[in-house]
Design a protein with these regions (language model features):
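Catalytic-core regions of core metabolic enzymes
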Residues: 1-499
Length: 499
């Protein structure tokens, strides 16, 4: 067996997790050819995801699966196994785990359910598996988990066939179902993932252990958690407080109500503490607690893509007046300040706009068709030391409205040149691409976030990646989403400044 330290890993739980999340060899125990079975879904996902290491199907029937030789027992595999993904029935797990121990498997992801979440008999079996694993120094994730996704290692060992792109957001979820749904949505929104773990019942490895691993993981910059219970609350707070100083932790606590507590008890076998106590502990540790899954995605997009604001002063640039008014109200309600703009900015912006423009913050562009004015207004705010962040409203998204206009004109006015209409569409599309690229450049230059709201719903996602840039523009659907994200980023900045 090779030495973990020879592969660049330290010793302890974090080292064992590093081996699991960066394996060279993976065995799927309970592999199957029956579409829809866990053993088939996980094996096909690993192979379709182009895992660069070696994959070994293990099935009592032998034969071939997905074009690979299948082994009747894990001991029949001649090579060392870093990771075993186990989908065998709960009743067969004692024998399977014993065989993994004898083989010297580094660690297991136990997909199988029917343990502590199912009652006393399941709890005893779960404890027995933990004892067997500890005795062999073999780490166990789960049981009752959806699996793991490790994009940087090219490993997608989950029943759900979402294979997110590489990124800096790590997600630990006690619910595999909720976790994989959010991973799928994150991929659609352009949010790259460093790691996903369905932690399941956390019989051996707890959320605190994952945080300790992620603290030194070079691929991870932001951590999101979905938790239904906390094992060893004191350790969780100590670890999360330390990790949160360098990597923001965003947490959604399930089971905040009596109905939710009952549902999660039968779901993961969770035992709950007081919601108020958990919330107070999170605030003490500086964690960002949210109340909805969508907030996890909104905040992970911002924290992984934008520079952190250094204060709570906001400049607002809006294509039209109404959104600016609403956004200013929401900023004040969230503790964000809207400072008056100095005379030099008034003069600069005034040279581009008609005399009836607002001459104040928010800067109302009065629906200007001059494509340079939004860029000038945003940069004037960024250059000024009186604001810490900019919210841009309705600059991007006009292309979709132009498309609708062109479609209408094509239908009702045959005298308008088709090439002219195509040029209008092309010009609006290229302007928005240029605007997005310019926002990335401005954030890199001034180290201040620009948070945008799209005028219309787009299919391009929240994060617009710009190759080779340190920051990437983000676009939300509503002003309240943008304001909430900025307020949470300011909250985290203030925590870091105090700690």
């Amino acid at each position: 067996m090779d030495n973990l330290q020879d592969r660049g890993f330290s010793t302890g739980t974090a080292a064992s997790l590093a081996c699991l999340f960066n394996p060279r060899t993976v065995a799927v125990i309970g592999a199957s050819s029956v579409i829809g079975k866990w053993g088939q879904m996980i094996l096909s996902n690993i192979l379709a995801g182009r895992f660069p290491g070696k994959t070994f199907p293990v099935n009592s029937g032998g034969g071939t699966l997905c074009g690979l030789n299948s082994y009747r027992r894990i001991q029949d595999v001649t090579e060392p196994i870093d990771l075993a993904v186990i989908t065998a029935p709960a009743g067969a797990l004692r024998e399977v785990v014993n065989e993994c121990c004898e083989k010297g498997v580094r660690g297991m992801v136990v997909i199988t359910s029917g343990f502590s979440e199912a009652g006393e008999e399941g709890r005893r079996l779960e404890e027995e598996l933990v004892s067997l694993s500890r005795a062999s120094q073999m780490i166990m994730i789960g049981p009752n988990t959806m699996g793991i996704l490790c994009p940087h290692a090219g490993l997608f060992a989950s029943g759900a066939h979402s294979r997110p792109g590489k990124g800096t957001v790590a997600f630990v979820s006690q619910s595999g179902n909720l976790g994989t749904q959010l991973i799928h949505w994150a991929d659609q929104q352009g949010i790259g993932i460093s790691l996903f773990v369905g932690s399941g019942n956390e019989a051996m490895v707890t959320c605190s252990d994952y945080l300790e691993y992620l603290e030194s993981d070079p691929h991870t910059g932001t951590i999101i958690l979905y938790m239904e219970s906390v094992k060893d609350g004191r350790r969780f707070i100590e670890v999360s407080r330390r990790v949160n100083r360098s990597k923001p932790i965003i947490v959604l606590k399930g089971g905040r109500t009596e109905a939710g507590k009952g549902a999660s008890a039968s779901h993961t076998g969770a035992m709950h503490g007081e919601t108020a106590v958990f919330g107070a502990a999170c605030r003490q540790a500086g964690l960002i607690e949210v109340s909805a899954p969508s907030e996890l995605l909104d905040l992970s997009a911002a924290f992984s893509s934008l520079p952190l604001p250094r204060g709570n002063r906001v400049g607002i640039v809006t294509l039209g007046g109404g959104w600016g008014v609403v956004t200013a109200d929401q900023c004040n309600e969230k503790g964000l300040l809207i400072p008056d703009i100095p005379d030099n900015i008034v003069r600069t912006i005034g040279s581009f706009l008609p005399p009836f423009w607002s001459r104040r913050n928010p800067i109302d562009l009065v629906g200007t068709k001059d494509l340079q004015v939004p860029l000038v207004a945003v940069e004037e705010f960024l250059k000024w030391d009186g604001v810490d962040a900019v919210i841009s409203l309705g600059i991007v998204g006009r292309h979709e409205l132009v498309q609708l206009l062109v479609q209408s004109v094509r239908e009702v006015d045959p005298d308008v040149s088709s090439s002219h209409l195509s040029q209008l569409e092309s010009a609006s599309r290229e302007y928005e691409k240029a605007y997005v690229a310019r926002m990335a450049d401005l954030m890199a230059e001034y180290r201040k976030p620009v948070i945008s709201v799209s005028l219309a719903r787009t299919q391009e996602g929240t994060v617009r990646h710009q190759q080779g840039k340190p920051y990437h523009p983000v676009f939300y659907q509503t002003p309240e989403d943008a304001v909430n994200v900025l307020a949470r980023m300011v909250q985290y900045h203030e925590y870091k400044a105090r700690s």
